[in-house]
């Protein structure tokens, strides 16, 4: 019985620190230093939320650039079911999925080069990836240009404008945020 009091007081102290002080402190610091990121990096047009800069969307129309496939459950890019497909490289089901995606992309992009960029046929680990390489976006230019009646040069400039360089050149590669790129495409039509 003599050991119960120190154990209980330690438990209550740690509960207060880890369950109260630490979460409140990190939330307050996040809201103070990074308010846009702490609130979901929401992309707004006026009072309307159009998406998040961190979560991809399922763009399927010919007039939009398509992102990486989503492996989330129930619906594509479901943030409540984030996760990869968990299919090993040796799994025949993964081969079938990739072959089907390649065939669909080639059918939708008949004027594109024959080699389909790998990120357009493989899902990311989170299933929510919103970025592709500028090369993968450029591969889709003929389809988008035809659907929107825009020039290849206009779309090339738009991809260059929305390309983001890595913080350190030798770590990572340039990427294009598909949500922001497609919203910019919609603004061109206005």
Curated annotation (Swiss-Prot):
It is found in: Cell inner membrane. One of its GO terms (cellular component) is plasma membrane. The chain crosses the membrane at residues 10-30. It is a single-pass membrane protein. Keywords: ATP-binding, Cell inner membrane, Cell membrane, Ion transport, Membrane, Nucleotide-binding, Potassium, Potassium transport, Transmembrane, Transmembrane helix, Transport. Pfam families: KdpC. GO terms for molecular function: ATP binding; P-type potassium transmembrane transporter activity. Part of the high-affinity ATP-driven potassium transport (or Kdp) system, which catalyzes the hydrolysis of ATP coupled with the electrogenic transport of potassium into the cytoplasm. This subunit acts as a catalytic chaperone that increases the ATP-binding affinity of the ATP-hydrolyzing subunit KdpB by the formation of a transient KdpB/KdpC/ATP ternary complex. The system is composed of three essential subunits: KdpA, KdpB and KdpC. Belongs to the KdpC family. This is Potassium-transporting ATPase KdpC subunit. The gene is kdpC.
